[in-house]
Amino acid sequence: MKAYLDLMQDVVDNGFDKGDRTGVGTRSVFGRQMRFNLQDGFPLVTTKKVHLRSIIYELLWFLKGSTDNTWLAERKVSIWNEWALENGDLGPIYGKQWRSWQCHDGRVIDQISEVIEQIRTKPNSRRLIVSAWNPAELPDESISPQDNVREGRMALAPCHCLFQFYVADGKLSCQLYQRSADLFLGVPFNIASYALLTHMIAQQCDLDVGEFVHTFGDCHLYRNHLTDDIVFEQLRREPRALPKLVIKRKPESIFGYELEDFEFEGYDPSPVIKAPIAI
């Protein structure tokens, strides 16, 4: 995962100091990319321990089409707690857009099912795309996430907003476009989540895995993470060997996976580094 540390160092060295929605402030760069050959190991950050249960459960939650934080909370996953209503509602975020995109003519599109069918039947298509960016349901930045949900909008605009698949030589690759990237807290989750999704869809489509390509718009470090015990502590650490992902069974569909289906052999990270969340 040297590419991840190199990007973090790039932001430290070359970033612009900017204000942001949260009021914390960031140092950011624009237009960067990382590439991971999934044949070389699973791209899980090793310079700090990453909470795998949260990553897996969140992805399964997206795939369920759920926008109810209660499902995550019942599994002791707290990553969405700050933005949800008391009843768990988060508005039409990722799960709804992936599984139930509402069209003006009344149709509802299950983008995940459609893209898997296209990978199977039209692997050379250049339209193997899933988008979470629905301008009609984006939040109003002048009010709170909770008030947005009450008005039928997303609690948060999607940060990882569009991904595309590519099939060649019997391998499935994925490119993610992430408009806004919290490099310290969010990006390790995002890398692992989309790499895992690529493995899952490849298995469902009887393909090997190729590359995961992670493309960024605004890639930033929050100012309160630019401290000796957070960002600079991570930069001092040496990356370790990547783990190997083992998927223990093949469910009948992409929607049948469970937490216990995934094992990450050889994951030996450095200790966790805690950091505050910008809300």
Curated annotation (Swiss-Prot):
Compartment list: Cytoplasm
GO BP, sorted A to Z: dTMP biosynthetic process; dTTP biosynthetic process; methylation
GO molecular function: thymidylate synthase activity
Pathway listed: Pyrimidine metabolism; dTTP biosynthesis
Any coiled-coil regions, as ranges: none
Binding site for (6R)-5,10-methylene-5,6,7,8-tetrahydrofolate: 51, 182, 278
Gene3D superfamilies, alphabetized: Thymidylate synthase/dCMP hydroxymethylase domain
Annotated active site: 159 (nucleophile)
Primary enzyme class: transferase
Keyword Cytoplasm: yes
E.C. numbers: 2.1.1.45
InterPro entries: Thymidate_synth/dCMP_Mease, Thymidate_synth/dCMP_Mease_dom, Thymidate_synth/dCMP_Mease_sf, Thymidylate_synthase
Positions that bind dUMP: 21, 126-127, 179-182, 190, 220-222
Quaternary state and interactors: Homodimer.
Family per record: Belongs to the thymidylate synthase family. Bacterial-type ThyA subfamily.
Protein name: Thymidylate synthase
Species of the source: Marinobacter nauticus (strain ATCC 700491 / DSM 11845 / VT8)
Source taxonomy: Bacteria, Pseudomonadati, Pseudomonadota, Gammaproteobacteria, Pseudomonadales
Gene name linked to the record: thyA
